[in-house]
Amino acid sequence: MIKWITRLFIVLILSQLFFLFFLSFYGVETTYFNSTIQEKVRALNPNINLEFQKTKILFDIKQLGLKIKIRNPKINVKGTSANLSKLNFGISIESLLKDEFALQNGEFGLFKTDIKQLIKIINQIKPSPFLIIAKKIFKEGKIEGVAEINFDNTGKIQDDYKITGLVSDFNAKILKKFRLSQIDSNFELI
């Protein structure tokens, strides 16, 4: 009887470990959370519409949390849209269970997008005089990149963010005397 209970206990532990490893490598794809995620985004800013097909949920063994990967994300802001290459979030299970702010980090990737289109989207999300000036100075160009940000317990963005990317075919006119044309450059903001 003791051998049988021991074997059952070992099988249960091994099956749970297998399940955790499966969730950490393959995860679960679902459309169940799509409307919830879209509603949360609209609650932050009613002008933003996030479109995507599926959500993939993975277990993060190192942080004892969840990784949320949104498949084929596209952001629309007042008729202007941009395709994102990735949209991933890290969520703390402990904070989620305590009903606290659970978002730990976010990773946003942008496919090659027209720089004026991106400025228009950002300006509609968070208006800034700098963006209005930049829209007049920047004549054309493409931008792509990845942003990694971390959040504190209250939901504010921490200062340890990292933005990397590439600007290509960039043209600008500063005042009437200075022109930049066909500039290709990598950038990194830390």
Where are these regions (language model features)?
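Extended terminal
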Residues: 1-10, 58
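Hydrophobic membrane-insertion alpha-helices, especially the h-region
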Residues: 6-22
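Terminal hydrophobic membrane-targeting helix
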Residues: 19-115, 135-136, 140-142, 146-152
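Extracytoplasmic/ectodomain regions of membrane proteins and secreted proteins
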Residues: 41, 140, 153-161, 171-174
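Beta-propeller and related beta-repeat scaffolds in trafficking/envelope systems
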Residues: 43, 55, 80-82, 89, ...
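Flexible, solvent-exposed coil segments and beta strand-coil junctions
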Residues: 66-69, 122-131, 163-170, 188-190
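Outer-membrane beta-barrel architecture
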Residues: 101-105, 158-164
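Extended, amphipathic, non-transmembrane alpha-helical segments
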Residues: 114-123
